[in-house]
Curated annotation (Swiss-Prot):
Enzyme Commission number(s) from the entry: 1.2.1.71
UniProt source species: Acinetobacter baylyi (strain ATCC 33305 / BD413 / ADP1)
Pathway terms, separated by semicolons: Amino-acid degradation; L-arginine degradation via AST pathway; L-glutamate and succinate from L-arginine: step 4/5
Name of protein: N-succinylglutamate 5-semialdehyde dehydrogenase
Entry binding sites for NAD(+): 223-228
Top EC class, one word: oxidoreductase
Family from the record: Belongs to the aldehyde dehydrogenase family. AstD subfamily.
Disulphide bridges, residue numbers: none
PANTHER family reported for this sequence: ALDEHYDE DEHYDROGENASE-RELATED
Functional summary from the UniProt entry: Catalyzes the NAD-dependent reduction of succinylglutamate semialdehyde into succinylglutamate.
């Protein structure tokens, strides 16, 4: 039944908007029920955050970090419980959600290091004083979280924002409210002062109200390109607000050379189908060189993909992947598969719904080499398209033939080709003999084009959580030895 599912100004209150529930995508068992925040409750949260900002911003960095490190300790202590919540809400296997919570823990130390390296304080001595650089927090930051990593990805905005001295109003995906609620309760236990972090639950209307609030100073978003573009339009004409958009991709993995076929297949499986294809860096396109080696790779890739273990989050032994986020998402993927076939794609491995009224789907592999005008879309699930090519010029052209620019990868022992990709590829992440889905929180994460607005997250999140303040300083004022022309003193 519904409960107090909003955290506003240090109090748990029930949403006054429409009620809704979330279900496990595979079993359809209801796992959470609650009510949306109304526009009035959105304003209450934003006003409370505005009131809390001055005190939090002037709290010493040492004291802010102490609270944030207590949160990390609580995450570690509650790792399995939170991982089970994420698994029940998303259907991701427990092995994977345990790694997600561990990434949340690690984010704290990494973000502290990034704060000092990217946005700390520095002083340069000068003959007549000093030049200093400091960084100041923006104020009230609206954080919009996605459903695919409902713990880790919002955490990647919230932690650096709080370290820098900002306050946060957090709206998670309406598909994963339970994870957000459980995470915020850990922040509460950590001793975060009232209204420094506020939680709003709801769908599109709640998000629009939050983005339009006059009390916010910035929006930090991870999610689809369509929603990101909508937020960009909403904030048009508001240059005083910082906007960080981390969106999707139509990512390409170029397979040029195949020495160890199973090693390449494993890399491709991890790139295309991990998390049921619901990572923004997943390989939506496999660009494979023509020839017998490429033919053999495709055959082996199909065999391994067909045999992937897909099942419930708590099954033993553990599956490689669970379902996609909802039955609606599964149906959309099946429709996308059929649309591609209707355009002329050749199905090499057909995606099927594995259980009735369930989000469990098998992988799809389609050859679209001879198909003109393939839609430049992000199919957010275990669906990948194969393109064949003859020379590397053609492969690079194919890889760059997208409005997105998140990630691209190369499989080849030839470093010269990788060096060329580093110059010619249009993507924020360029990997070499590594899965596209591999990323490091100690590096920036983001893309160009429809994948983002040049506000990389991860280690560079510190950059959009504070603004630089430059100063020329001198403890004493004295008349210069030489005056400018035209001045008589």
């Amino acid at each position: 039944m519904s409960h107090a599912n909003l955290w506003i100004d240090g109090n748990w209150v029930q949403g006054q908007g429409k009620s809704w529930n979330t279900c496990n995508p595979v079993s359809q068992q209801v796992v959470w029920q609650g009510n949306e925040a109304t526009a009035q409750q959105v304003e209450q949260a934003c006003e409370a955050a505005r009131q809390a900002f001055p005190q939090w911003a002037t709290t010493s960095l040492t004291d802010r970090i102490a609270i944030i490190e207590r949160f990390a300790l609580l995450l570690e202590q509650n790792k399995e419980a939170l991982a089970k919540i994420i698994s029940q809400e998303t259907s991701k296997p427990l092995w994977e959600t345990l790694t997600e919570v561990q990434s949340m823990v690690a984010k704290v130390a990494i973000s502290i290091r990034a704060y000092h390296q990217r946005t700390g304080k520095s002083i340069t001595e000068m003959a007549d004083g000093a030049a200093s650089l400091r960084h100041r927090p923006h104020g009230v930051m609206a954080v919009f979280g996605p459903y695919n990593f409902p713990g880790h990805l919002p955490n990647g905005h919230i932690v650096p924002a709080l370290i820098a001295g900002n306050v946060v109003v957090f709206k998670p995906s309406e598909l994963t409210p339970w994870t957000a609620e459980a995470t915020v309760k850990l922040w509460q236990q950590a001793g975060l002062p009232n209204a420094v972090l506020n939680l709003l639950q709801g769908s599109r209307e709640t998000g629009i109200a939050l983005a339009q609030s006059e009390h916010i100073d910035g929006v930090l978003f991870t999610g689809s390109a369509s929603t990101g573009y909508q937020l960009h339009r909403q904030l048009a004409g508001a240059p005083e607000k910082i906007l960080a958009l981390e969106m999707g991709g139509n990512n390409a993995l170029i397979i040029e050379d195949i020495d160890d076929i199973d090693a390449v297949v494993h890399l491709a499986i991890q790139s295309a189908f991990i998390s049921a294809g619901q990572r923004c860096t997943c390989a939506r396109r496999l660009i494979i060189k023509n020839g017998q080696a490429g033919d053999a790779f495709i055959q082996r890739f199909i065999e391994v993909a067909r045999d992937l273990v897909i099942g419930d989050w708590d099954a033993e032994p553990q599956p490689f992947m669970g379902g996609v986020i909802s039955v609606k998402a599964a149906e959309a993927l099946l429709k996308a598969q059929q649309n591609l076939i209707d355009l002329g794609a050749r199905s090499l491995l057909e995606m099927k719904q594995l259980r009735e009224n369930s989000a469990l789907v098998s992988p799809a592999i389609l050859d679209v080499t001879a198909v003109p005008d393939i839609p430049d879309e992000e199919y957010f699930g275990p669906l990948t398209c194969i393109y064949r090519y003859d020379d590397f010029d053609e492969a690079l052209k194919l890889a760059n033939s997208t409005r997105f620019g998140l990630s691209v990868g190369l499989v080849s022992p030839k470093r010269a080709l990788f060096e060329r990709m580093l110059i010619e590829a249009r993507a924020g992440i360029v990997n070499w003999n590594k899965p596209l889905t591999g990323a490091s929180s100690a590096a920036p994460f983001g893309g160009v084009g429809a994948s983002g607005n040049h506000r990389a997250s991860a280690f560079y999140a510190a950059d959009y959580c504070a603004w630089p303040m430059a100063s020329l300083e001198s403890e004493q004022l004295s008349l210069p030895e030489k005056l400018s022309p035209g001045i008589v003193l």
